[in-house]
Amino acid sequence: GPVGRNTGEVIGVFGTLDWQEAKRANLSTLIGGQSSGITQVSFASSVDVHNLRKIESHLQKLQSPVWPQDILGSIDQQRASRGESIFNEYCVSCHARIDRADPDRRIIANMSRVSDVGTDPRMSENSINAQGYSGILRNQYVGLEVGDILLDRKAPVAALLTKATLNVVATPDPDKWFFQRWTDWIVDITKAFFHNEIKSSIKQGNYDPDTTASPLASLNAYKARSLNGIWATAPYLHNGSVPTLYDLLLPKKCEGDPEDGEYRPDQFQVGSREFDPAKVGLKSSGYKGSTFDTSLKGNSNAGHEYASGKTAQLNGKVLKPLTKDEKLDLLEYLKTL
């Protein structure tokens, strides 16, 4: 659930972990799925699970930002109306339209194989193939979708992170005084394991299912998010390789393409806070910033070229390329989301 997701993010970014052999099994090791009869591990960490849960609770009350017409200019309603029809044909099968004001909404997100959508595969490949030393976690079991795997001397990083996240959530905060520590822990455990309104469900879309031979195969796919507030989230694609929404509607220049065509930039500047309301994104040239080079591994700006007639829809159909005017119509509609 949300608590596990946020805990995993903190561990992956800047959390400090102090894993030590525990003297004996306890309630935390039991909840964390640690096997009896082997070395028990204490998962003390700098992760404040209680605060993460409170932050998540506050985030549930937020709504996506609305295009500020008094600052960035009025939306052309006629263009936006035409763009809505294009969105319905080209986009909505993956990117569900939602009501930003409805806190009880449920979103069915569709998965797309990296090979199908054509975007840079490095992140998904790393999530599946990255290995790390298990240390004192060796010989622990980790429960995955298709069953338990036994951690060897080297094990998939995704499995190690899963084990660490579950046990960090299950461990009381050692920095708090006794009463506060256990009060917060009981509340957090109850909320994390029993009050999660979003239940686990089968993934939807096109992806390779996990199997006993490849227990992390489904990670080789990206999830299509709803596009509410998309105008405010530049740069685009999962690796930030496309600076503006307008550029996202263009194809990547490939060998043999005409030189006078309009393509996604292979290099652009990042670091500006100046917004470009015409292309919908942050200013990406004309200043001294850091250069984003799409030729580097992990930085490719290819793929997701539906508007250019190069990427197939979920049903396998490739739609015709949009004209310049149709792209501007779609861009105008995206401002309204």
Predicted regions and their residues:
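Periplasmic c-type cytochrome electron-transfer domains
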Residues: 1-337
